[in-house]
């Protein structure tokens, strides 16, 4: 009986900690499947100094979560999910491409074929300032061209 209770408790605990699918909606109502990982946890700040050495012109903003990425952070503001691709925000017409530079804060910068997303936080600087989640790491602010991602940068707005 005791062994059975331990097994049931283990199964209950595992079920409570399972990954789950979360649906987020674009402003036009398109549904995007995201993942909420059971193992999502606040990152240690021990690597911030090392990142700062590698990118001295970037400003550390805040601690990130391990199973959250740039797309979820930039497009939804959430740190509890992982979004594989934000392309529906554009393809359904919720956001439109902006020619040239961003025109206001809060617009979204996208690198290459949606390899990275960031929030424009100062469109008026020569190199527009963006705030973004670097992979599964922390949240940083820097000039868009200074971010550690490659590809042409496109800006999107509502």
Listing of model-derived features with the role each one plays in the protein:
Residues 73-75, 95, 155-156:
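Aromatic side chains
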